[in-house]
Curated annotation (Swiss-Prot):
The keyword Mitochondrion does not apply. Residues 45-88 are annotated as: Knottin domain. Residues 23-44 form a propeptide. PROSITE patterns: SPIDER_CSTX. It comes from Lycosa singoriensis (Wolf spider). This is U4-lycotoxin-Ls1a. Belongs to the neurotoxin 19 (CSTX) family. 05 (U4-Lctx) subfamily. It is found in: Secreted. Keywords: Calcium channel impairing toxin, Disulfide bond, Ion channel impairing toxin, Knottin, Secreted, Signal, Toxin.
Length: 109
């Protein structure tokens, strides 16, 4: 039993050493590739859609609130034809969580 434990510890030690050597070699090559990609990267931020504005053109374009991103809700208004209307809105749960966080910030300081 002691021999089995000794060999398993030895095996794990050798395995972890060999895997770290392979990872170190991979990391150095990956870092050079990543740096060259980052040098060529361009910022492509598009304008976000403010709260309560129409987001039917891009349903993932709603702006962020203090903590959470607003959600694009689509609905069919009553009395009109079957035209879908979408707007960026803050879910009630997110509103309550932001209020609790604001209260906690004022209490804690």
């Amino acid at each position: 039993m002691k021999v089995l434990v000794l060999f398993s510890v030895l095996f794990l030690t050798l395995f972890s050493y060999s895997s770290t050597e392979a990872i170190d070699e991979f990391d150095s090559d990956a870092e050079e590739d990543m740096l060259s990609l980052m040098a060529n990267e361009q910022v492509r931020a598009k304008a976000c859609t403010p709260r309560l504005h129409d987001c039917s053109h891009d349903r993932h374009s709603c702006c962020r609130g203090e903590l959470f991103k607003d959600v694009c809700y689509c609905f069919y208004p009553e009395g009109e034809d079957k035209t879908e209307v979408c707007s960026c809105q803050q879910p009630k749960s997110h509103k309550y969580i932001e209020k609790v966080v604001d209260k906690a910030k004022t209490v804690v300081g």
